Amino acid sequence: MIVDDNQLVLTLLARMLQNEYNVTEFMDARSALAAIETGKIPDVIISDIMMPKMDGQAFYEEIRKLGSYSTRFLFITGGAVTEESLEFERKMAALGRLLLKPFEADQLRAALNKTLTLQGALEYEH
């Protein structure tokens, strides 16, 4: 699952991954959350952090409130805007779950492979 409010970024990410993964795309976190609430639980979510309505951190927290701890996250960002988002980015970077824009396709694949192989116990809320 890819969640990004920028259509161009969303399309590029999907194209980079569609040959290797089953990709679903959402332009906002609320729509992605609604899909997950209906039982469409992905193995991994690639999400922008800075999005209107619901940012990546709030999206992450809502997924965890649903009790979905098996879904892994890889966050992408152009840089923190608030102190709260900076702290969240630091936590995700420490876990190897953050990719800074701009990035190349091979960097995305490497980060995604690393995310998929990390143990769920490494989630910061545990």
Which residues does each predicted region cover?
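Active-site residues of response regulator receiver
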Residues: 48
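Conserved phosphotransfer cores of two-component systems
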Residues: 37-40, 62-71, 91-93
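Acidic, metal-coordinating helix/loop segments flanking the phosphotransfer/catalytic sites
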Residues: 25-44
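Hydrophobic/aromatic residues positioned on beta-strands within the core alpha/beta folds
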Residues: 76-78
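Receiver (REC) domain active-site loop signature in two-component systems and cognate sites
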Residues: 51
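C-terminal output helix
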Residues: 100-112, 120
